[in-house]
Every structure is written in C-alpha cells, then in structure tokens.
UniProtKB/Swiss-Prot annotation:
The keyword Magnesium does not apply. This is Protein Wnt-2. A lipid is attached at S212 (O-palmitoleoyl serine). SMART domains: WNT1 (SM00097). One of its GO terms (biological process) is cardiac epithelial to mesenchymal transition. It comes from Monodelphis domestica (Gray short-tailed opossum). Keywords: Developmental protein, Disulfide bond, Extracellular matrix, Glycoprotein, Lipoprotein, Secreted, Signal, Wnt signaling pathway. It is found in: Secreted, Extracellular space, Extracellular matrix; Secreted. Residues 1-26 form the signal peptide.
Length: 360
C-alpha cells in the first residue's frame, strides 16, 4: 500500500468517528415541557454550563424561548406535512425528535436552522412587546433618515433583531462550540443560516401624517415578517441543501460533489443521505408511513404511490362537518351553514413482513 493510500485512510478515521458519535442533542428544545425558570434551568438535561448560566441570568428570556419552541416545531411540521418524515416530535424525549436527527441529514440541517431562527424570532418579538428587562425596541432607530420615497422619521417600535440574534447565538451555539467534530461544525453553520433567514425578511413599515391623508410626514419602523416567510425560505434551502465533507485540516467544509457550488452562509449543509423513512426503524428514529393519509390524485410527495412506498393503501369512507351555503350579509359578515360531507380517506398500508424492503 502506498503512502497516499495510507494518508487517505488516516484522514478518514476522525471523520468516521465524528459521525458515529455526533453532537446532536439540542436539549434546550425540551424547554417547552418544563415549568418555572429555576426548575427549567436545573432540570433540562444536557444543557452546558454556558447555557445554564444564561438561563439563570435571564429567566424571562428562557420563557420566551420555551414558548417559541411550539411555534417553530409547528412551522417544521407545516413544511414537512406532505413528506414521509413529517417532523414528528416526541414529548418525552429530551431532544424532542428522538433518534431521527442522529444522522447528519438534510432533515437535521433544516431542524437546526428553523430552531435557531425560532429563537431569534421569539426573543425579538418579546423585546418589542416589553416582556424582557434586558431589551426593548431597537435603540439605533432614532432621528431622521431617507429612503427611495424621501425623508422620514424613525418612530414606533422597531424590532430589535440584533439583540435577538446576539442572544440566540450565545445560547443556541454554546453546546456546539464545545465540540470540534464535523457534526458540531455542521450544526453551527445551519444555526447561523437560520438566524440570517429571520433578518432577511425584516421590512420597513411606515405611516403617513398630514392633512386629508397627505404624506407630508412619514414615521417608519422595522418589523419582522410573519414566521411563515422564514419557514418557506428555509424550506427552499432544504430542497437545495448542499452535501459536504470536511476539508483536510478539519476546520471547514468542501462540497462532496465538485460539480456543485461551494455553500454560502445562507445555504444549508449536510453530510449523510437521508433514509427513506418508509418503515418503522427505532435505530434510525423513523416512524414509517403506515397509517399516514395520502393523496390519491397527487403526483407529489404526498401521493399514495410515494407516501406509501409502493405498499398500497386502504380506503375508508368518513363523514365530516364542513361549512357550506355561505352568504355575505351587509355589513360585514359571512354566514355559513354546517353540512355533513362524506369523503374517501386513503391511508398507507403497513409492511407485509418485518423484513420487507421498500422498492423506492
């Protein structure tokens, strides 16, 4: 065996080890399930010392982060609603998603990005609503400024997104910064991409002042867009996520396929291909798709052919209540009747045997 081959084997060893024992458990995700701040700081498993320190110093911020977990997990489930893996959460698991994120996959990349974005959004919103002692509206947005429409005065309450990003970086990244392996670097990259996504949709809103609606004076402020905007953007980044490998000195990434562009700070990155999520696999954290509702007429990921992995589907007829015969009444209401509707619901069949293998 020549020296170059030996070097290749030596180089691959730490990368393999880093994937076997990844730093995946973002235990702060579990904060939605705990109560008071002191109990939260002392009982969330897996928090590193820096996170516990911030937790004790800023209990009101921790409450905002905990409440925000429900918002970003709901957004994750919305984005994956038509896919085999649907961002299912496990209430009794301290990392919230079970073993599914042990793999350094596209799904892991998205979850780390959307969770980091959710922390920025929750903290920034709490600042603007006066719920936090440590921050308020953006103090830099004062005085007079100009844009394409002319001069305006900063007024109202501009969202203090810089504070939200700063705190989120200190808290969310703390555990990853203690690690030096490939997975920690992947998580840090995707965390940053999530934070940047929220700031990307910061928008200027203005109000006109003057006689008869004229705009002789404008007052403007900066406001975050609805979190769905961030979710939709990160979903596009998920679909265009770039597979990477560690560079030779272990300090960064290079693309796994040289035909693809180098990832930017806005892109999501991953190391490993995703499982197919067709069957229940405890080791992989997959719940499988047996019993999932599928769309018989769709040609997308929610189609019965794709969702059910070629296993077929069962059809049942169900009765549900819907709104019907809606009429507009002056002014200003729409009134509807409740009607019963009979519909066919298609659900994926279970595998025929434990050793069944998906054809897709």
């Amino acid at each position: 065996m020549n020296s170059s081959s030996l070097f290749g084997i030596w180089l691959s060893v730490p990368l393999i080890l880093s994937w076997v024992t990844p730093q995946v458990s973002s235990s702060w995700w579990y904060m939605r399930a705990v109560g008071s701040s002191r109990v939260m700081c002392d009982n969330v498993p897996g928090l590193v010392s820096r996170q516990r320190q911030l937790c004790h110093r800023h209990p009101e911020v921790m409450r905002s982060i905990g409440l925000g977990v429900a918002e970003w997990t709901a957004e994750c489930q919305h984005q994956f609603r038509q896919h085999r893996w649907n961002c299912h959460t496990l209430d009794r698991d301290h990392n919230l998603f079970g073993k599914v994120l042990l793999r350094s996959s596209r799904e892991a990349a998205f979850v780390y990005a959307i969770s980091s974005a959710g922390v920025v959004f929750a903290i920034t919103r709490a600042c603007s609503q006066g719920e936090l002692k440590s921050c308020s509206c953006d103090p830099k947005k004062k005085g007079t400024s100009k844009d394409s429409k002319g001069t305006f005065d900063w007024g109202g309450c501009s969202d203090n997104i810089d504070y939200g990003i700063k705190f989120a970086r200190a808290f969310v990244d703390a555990k990853e910064r203690k690690g030096k392996d490939a997975r920690a670097l992947m998580n840090l990259h995707n965390n940053r991409a999530g934070r940047k996504a929220v700031k990307r949709f910061l928008k200027q809103e203005c109000k006109c002042h003057g006689v008869s609606g004229s705009c002789t004076l404008r007052t403007c402020w900066l406001a975050m867009a609805d979190f769905r905007k961030t979710g939709d953007y990160l979903w596009k980044k998920y679909n265009g996520a770039i597979q990477v490998v560690m560079n030779q000195d272990g300090t960064g990434f290079t693309v796994a396929n040289k035909r693809f562009k180098k990832p930017t700070k806005n892109d999501l990155v991953y190391f490993e291909n995703s499982p197919d999520y067709c069957i229940r696999d405890r080791d992989a954290g997959s719940l499988g798709t047996a019993g999932r509702v599928c769309n018989l007429t769709s040609r997308g990921m929610d189609s019965c052919e794709v969702m059910c992995c070629g296993r077929g589907y069962d059809t049942s007829r169900v009765t549900r209540m819907t709104k019907c015969e809606c009429k507009f009444h002056w002014c200003c209401a729409v009134r509807c009747q409740d009607c019963l509707e009979v519909v066919d619901v298609h659900t994926c069949k279970a595998p025929k045997s434990p050793d069944w293998v998906a054809p897709t």
